[in-house]
Amino acid sequence: GEEIAGAKQSEFDKLRGTKMGLVPQDPMSNLNPVWRIGTQVKEALKANNMDVAHEKRSALAKALAGDEVEVKGNDDETFLGAKELPELMTEAKKALTEAGVSGEAFDKAVARFTNEWVPGSETRWRVADDLIKAGVADDQAWYLAKKYVTGSTMDDRIAGLLSEAGLPDAATRARQFPHEFSGGMRQRALIAIGLACRPDLLIADEPTSALDVTVQKRILDHLHMLTDSLGTAVLFITHDLGLAAERAQHIVVMYKGQVVESGPSLEVLQHPQHPYTKRLVAAAPSLASQRIISAKERGEDADALLDHHIAGESTLEKSEHIITVDHLTKEFKLPRKKEMFKAVDDVSFSVKRGTTLAIVGESGSGKSTVANMVLHLLKPTSGKVFYEGRDTSTFKSKDLLGFRRHVQPVFQNPYGSLDPMYSIFRSIEEPLRIHKIGDKKWRANRVKELLDMVEMPASVMGRYPNELSGGQRQRIAIARAMALDPDVIVCDEAVSALDVLVQDQVLRLLNDLQAEKGLSYLFITHDLAVVRQIADEVVVMQHGKLVEHATTDEVFDHPQKQYTRDLLDAIPGGKLQLGLD
């Protein structure tokens, strides 16, 4: 019940960590790339006086209190954290002397401090690193460091927090850097940091929006178990209404900085009152199965939709394959490993002209590796990719330039794929310049046409990517991909980072362009709910292998493999009947 809106910075500092924890959205932006994971967990503990050094101060205070001696000054400043025993002992004696402690009480306090002190976790890491530099294998070096170097209670606490957040082999993981973790593991590390100081409230800001559905489900299940056992309240910020419906008891809907609707979760989502809430529910891809059913009820069967996709291509048969992947395999050499890692293992499929084929699977299933080989950005270890019946591995530089003109990518992060130093005009015009298409005046008019095609005003031509929203940047990326009038667009997680309304707009734009231009899409995604909105066929991948390939309706209504069923079961809100009328 305490009012904190007008609180001072110092008052907020006391609330952060111990009263309120945070799990942010993007772990790569919120984890320091040059700090070990364990160091970052320790930082959270130290910032809130819950580290080993603070325990030393507490032990000293208790020793003094036993003799009814009052410590003067700020106890938090008595000792500094990661210092070795001699320096800490000097500061301890100085602090005791300044506090007026002497004689037997002084000796007792110093003895207690000395007996309790053990080297910090940094000592183990330093020894392990020296062993590795001397040629000892990483696992063996860490084993020796743990066995022969006295550890601290901080080591155990950090490992305990990481293990509690669901990370296996937590002691080893604590020594690793963020780039050595998968997306799901990094998110678990952030959960460990957020809950390290046992806050009363945990603010989870889009904690799983970039993760695939099965990893998302495991992490959220684990987070629910943790917060429930700790008695921690959760403020869950999300654009995914399926997640909100499944995970929250109460929902607050915000629009342009104001609360427009609130109430019990199912009541709000089954009976939305505000127009904005109704738009959110209608656009939510987690609930898209109901929208597909209602489309069928209107008589739009799959064949009619497919005919619509290839309007204007009457000379071509529907079964004609524009992209064929034949027994594709890709292996990578891993550091310090003799065996090769097989990222893609004997995958075959074809993309029919004018249709959309989606490749789905968990992170690490090989989806993006397949996409990169189709785009000729990676060379297959074995197998072939055919474009209109031609083996792309036989292409010379001139052929490859022509191939690039006909097969274009749209990547997940438009801010990463658009040069931040290029204006929007230059970004869209660049492929036209590279392929020597038209003069300067013609290219300027073409850029305007492309912007109009993706429903962006011509006024954005002089702006830069950082001046646009995520959805606007993705529209620019699509306009750039459309500049050369391609036959195929490879969309690699093209809508996964967008909120539901923008995602819905981009998906509708892709559908409209497909109907108008007869485009073929290879759509890479971890979100099966999106797949149902846009795909004609689905390929399911697991551990680099193709485990299922069928039409979208067959995969969703009659999945053959248990892995596919697990993916479908993990779709947030997929089984909830919400108000879409």
Question: Where on the chain are the PLM-derived regions?
Answer:
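Conserved ABC transporter NBD signature motif
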Residues: G1-E3, S58, A137, G383-D391
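Conserved ABC ATPase signature
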Residues: F177-F181, M185, Y464-L468, Q472
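ABC ATPase C-loop
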Residues: A189, G194-L195, I476, M482
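ABC ATPase "signature
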Residues: V259-G263, H271, H549-A550
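Helix-to-loop junction immediately C-terminal to a conserved catalytic motif
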Residues: L375
